[in-house]
Every structure is written in C-alpha cells, then in structure tokens.
Design a protein with these regions (language model features):
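Active-site region of the double-stranded beta-helix
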Residues: 1-197, 210-248
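Well-ordered alpha/beta subsegment
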Residues: 202, 206-212
Length: 248
C-alpha cells in the first residue's frame, strides 16, 4: 500500500478550505466480513446484515438530469487534486448545475445501486484488494476555496472506479452531502445525499460519485487504483461549470 500517495493533504487559502487524511486505521480484506463501528471496521464471523445483503424497494430521489459528453484523459499521474490521476471533462450545455439534496435512505440510494448501512451492520466489500480504512476531514469552505479554484482543485468533478467506498460520519456535527449518479446514452442523473449520523453510504465499484461536498470528519474507505475515470464539469467553451447543492 502506497500510503504517501493515499494520504490526502489539500489546503486552500481559507482556514476551512482543506481535505486531510488524519489517520489510516487499517485495512479491510476481500472475502471477509466486518462490523461497522465509529472506531473502525471490526473483523467478525457473523452473518452479513440482511439490509446489506438484499436489494431494497426503490424510491426515486429528487434529482437533476442533463445530457453530457464524457471525455476521458490518458494521464494517470496523481495530482494534488486527485490521488488517482489526471482528470478529463464532462462537457454539458450549462454554466451552472444545482443538484437536489435529499436525506439518504435505503430506498432512495437503491435507485442508484448504493446502500445505506448503519453502525453495527455486518458487511463485506466487493473487492479483490485490501482497502484502507481512514479518518478524513473536510473543511466547510473546501468546495468554494479549493475545489472550484482552477489552479488548486481544478473544478467540481464526478468519477467512477473499480473499488468500493464507505463514508460514515464520526459525529453529529458533520454536514454536506455525497453526489451519486448514473448515466445512459449520455443522459446523466445526479442526486446529493445527506448522511445521517449513525449511518453510512456504501458505494459499489463503478458507480458515479463525488465526495468533495461532504463537510466534517468521516470514516472513509477509499483506495488507489489504475482503473478509474474522473471528469470535471465544463461548458462547451471549456469554462468550469458552477456546481452547487440545493434543496429538493
């Protein structure tokens, strides 16, 4: 595991414009089961929780739909803004994008194929590699004073990769939301999910997502992989699209 590449330490010019990996607690291994706790993932022989194992009834969340062209990049060199590598472009015919925000539930996450988990649940990760378990903090002005600054974060993005994620608030002060979406024939559907304390979002491999709009301290499982695609929202004249989260 390349911890130097894995650890994030992004800071802007504002006191709250940061995303920092505070700690790597350990790893979760393929084919093993873990109990979710605020102190990490605990190895167990218990059965996988039913709410994680079975698909839930689907409820369509508030969302935004638009057409876009996904333009990949061949650059796989990691940058300060993206530990995976370079970013391509998602070209859309808009200069602003407001993604509706909803509270995450098992039913509305199922619309995209993600899963709601809660403290105490037993889960198994869809992976063939060990995945680091981290504590990561995101400042309240990270989006405005780092992510959206072209020579720092490079602009709001969406991505997919072949590794799963877990995002779990570590206390009640967390806020913000996680963007999750899907696409078909260049038509994109996105929603922003608030994560209630005591719960988390499991994002399976290859699902469209972005976690930069979360705020606070989270237990996050993420990894470095060569099989990914990250794109920045841009208009046809290559200007950054102003992406924001709004009430549904």
């Amino acid at each position: 595991m390349d911890l130097d590449r894995l650890k994030v330490n992004r800071t802007g010019d504002h006191a709250q414009s940061f995303m920092i990996t505070d700690e790597v607690l350990g790893t979760v291994e393929p084919g093993k089961r873990y109990r979710i706790t605020l102190n990490g993932l605990v190895l167990t022989d218990a059965d996988i929780s039913q709410n994680f194992k079975h698909k839930r009834q689907v409820k369509t969340p508030a969302n935004i739909q638009f057409h876009g062209v996904w333009i990949t990049t061949e650059d796989t060199k990691a940058t300060d803004a993206n530990i995976l590598g370079g970013s391509g472009t998602l070209q859309i015919n808009q200069t602003e994008l407001c993604i509706p925000e909803v509270v995450a539930t098992a039913e509305n996450l199922s619309f995209y194929g993600a899963k709601l988990v809660q403290l105490g649940d037993i889960i198994e990760f869809e992976t063939t590699e060990a995945l680091p378990v981290t504590i990561t903090r995101v400042g309240s002005s990270y989006v405005e004073h780092y992510l959206k600054v072209e020579n720092k974060g490079g602009g709001a993005y969406i991505e997919y990769h072949d590794r799963p994620h877990l995002h779990l608030p570590t206390d009640k002060s967390t806020s913000g939301s996680m963007i999750i979406g899907h696409s078909f024939d260049n038509k994109y559907t996105l929603s922003a999910f608030k994560i209630p304390f005591g719960y988390g979002i499991y994002t399976p491999p290859n699902l469209l997502h972005a976690d930069a709009f979360l705020v606070g301290k989270f237990l996050v499982i993420y990894s470095v992989t060569e099989h990914f695609s990250t794109v920045i929202f841009r208009s046809p004249n290559h200007e950054l699209v102003d992406v924001n989260i709004g009430a549904s």
